[in-house]
Amino acid sequence: MDLLFGRRKTPEELLRQNQRALNRAMRELDRERQKLETQEKKIIADIKKMAKQGQMDAVRIMAKDLVRTRRYVRKFVLMRANIQAVSLKIQTLKSNNSMAQAMKGVTKAMGTMNRQLKLPQIQKIMMEFERQAEIMDMKEEMMNDAIDDAMGDEEDEEESDAVVSQVLDELGLSLTDELSNLPSTGGSLSVAAGGKKAEAAASALADADADLEERLKNLRRD
């Protein structure tokens, strides 16, 4: 019947049903063949027994029976082979149908993804990503430059001191000894000269403060 619980069977259910029927038929053929093979052995034993007793008429009759039995065995073997071939074809159909269903699902999913992936939007997203990446690179470069400017002098001074110390160590001297051995400039600096230098430094500092104050006023007016 093509109906199952009031509904029509699917192709997969029909294939499974036919597959079970074919397997059942092959098992029945195997049982019948085994019975005939057992009967064949018994007929051969009876033929030998009757031949020893000299009952040749019975031997001829049993020989014909043996021929028929062997013919039936060959028929059962051939029938089973044909049924097995049909069973393999059904299995191939099931596999092909399963593959077709899987391909159908994959094709549907691919179509959905292609509809969702819109090329202009993707291009816009990629352009925005590149722009943000460039901004990030610029900010990182500016921060690195600022850090280098802030730390550069101190690092250079430390490296210079390290080089001087290394050279003096190689010469077996110390930085303190070298500084103490520097020649004097011919006496101490006069108070007047020191005062002039202090006044010059104070004047330069005042000028710098005035310039900074003027810039701040200009910024407030703007």
From Swiss-Prot:
Stretches for region Interaction with VTA1: 217-222
Keywords, ordered alphabetically = Acetylation, Coiled coil, Endosome, Host-virus interaction, Membrane, Nucleus, Phosphoprotein, Protein transport, Transport, Ubl conjugation
Which parts of the sequence carry Phosphoserine? 184, 188, 190, 203
Region (Interaction with VPS4B) residue spans: 56-222
**What Gene Ontology terms describe where this protein resides (cellular component)?**
amphisome membrane; autophagosome membrane; chromatin; cytosol; ESCRT III complex; extracellular exosome; kinetochore; kinetochore microtubule
Tell me which residues bear N-acetylmethionine: 1
Major location category of this protein: membrane
Q: Molecular function (GO) terms listed?
A: phosphatidylcholine binding; protein domain specific binding
Which compartment or compartments is the protein found in?
A: Late endosome membrane; Nucleus envelope
Q: Give the bilayer topology.
A: Peripheral membrane protein
Pfam families linked: Snf7 (PF03357)
Q: Which residues form a coiled coil?
A: 12-53, 195-222
Reading the lineage from the top rank, the first entry is Eukaryota
The motif MIT-interacting motif: which residues? 210-220
> What is its biological role?
Probable core component of the endosomal sorting required for transport complex III (ESCRT-III) which is involved in multivesicular bodies (MVBs) formation and sorting of endosomal cargo proteins into MVBs. MVBs contain intraluminal vesicles (ILVs) that are generated by invagination and scission from the limiting membrane of the endosome and mostly are delivered to lysosomes enabling degradation of membrane proteins, such as stimulated growth factor receptors, lysosomal enzymes and lipids. The MVB pathway appears to require the sequential function of ESCRT-O, -I,-II and -III complexes.
Give the quaternary structure: Probable core component of the endosomal sorting required for transport complex III (ESCRT-III). ESCRT-III components are thought to multimerize to form a flat lattice on the perimeter membrane of the endosome. Several assembly forms of ESCRT-III may exist that interact and act sequentially. In vitro, heteromerizes with CHMP3 (but not CHMP4) to form helical tubular structures that expose membrane-interacting sites on the outside whereas VPS4B can associate on the inside of the tubule. Interacts with CHMP1B, CHMP2B, CHMP3, CHMP4A, CHMP4B, CHMP4C and CHMP5.
Protein name according to UniProt: Charged multivesicular body protein 2a
Q: Which organism is it from?
A: Homo sapiens (Human)
Gene symbol of the encoding locus:
CHMP2A
